[in-house]
Amino acid sequence: MLEEIKYKLKRKLFRQMEAYDITLDELKEKQMKGAEIIDVRNKREYDESHILGSINVPEYQINESFEKIVPNKNKEIVVYCSSGFRSASAYRRLRCLGYMNVWNLYGGLENY
C-alpha cells in the first residue's frame, strides 16, 4: 500500500499541467455547454465508476472507432482516465485524427 502511494505521488509530481489540460471546474463548464466527455479507460474500469454522461472509448480503440462515435471534428471533447496519462495519449491521437477542440481532464478521476 505504501509503495502504491509513493508511486502515485511521484507520478503527480513529475506530471506538469499542459496547455490542453483543464481543471474540474472547466470540465463542468464545458459539460454544461454540451461537450462530449470521453472516458478512455477500459470497460471494466468504466463500469466500476465514471463521470455521469460520459462515453467509454478505450484509448487503444480511438484510431479505429472514434470517427463513428463523434463524426463532428469541431465538437468540443474532454477526455479523461484514472490519472491523466492515458487521456493525454488519447488527446494526441484525437488531434492527429483532426479533432481540434480537445481537452484533457488534468489528474483524471483521481481529482474528480
Predicted regions mapped to residue ranges:
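Short, structured coil segments at secondary-structure junctions
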Residues: 50-52, 98
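Catalytic cysteine-centered active loop of the rhodanese-like fold, especially the PTP/DSP P-loop
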Residues: 67-112
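Short, flexible helix/strand-to-coil boundary loops that buttress conserved ligand/catalytic motifs
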Residues: 31, 50, 66, 106
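Conserved beta-strand scaffold positions in the cores of enzyme catalytic domains, especially
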Residues: 21, 37, 54-56, 102-104
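Short acidic active-site motifs
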Residues: 26, 61-66
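Membrane-proximal soluble helical/coiled-coil segments
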Residues: 44-45, 55-56, 62-64
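Flexible, polar/low-complexity N-terminal or interdomain linker segments that lie immediately upstream
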Residues: 1-48
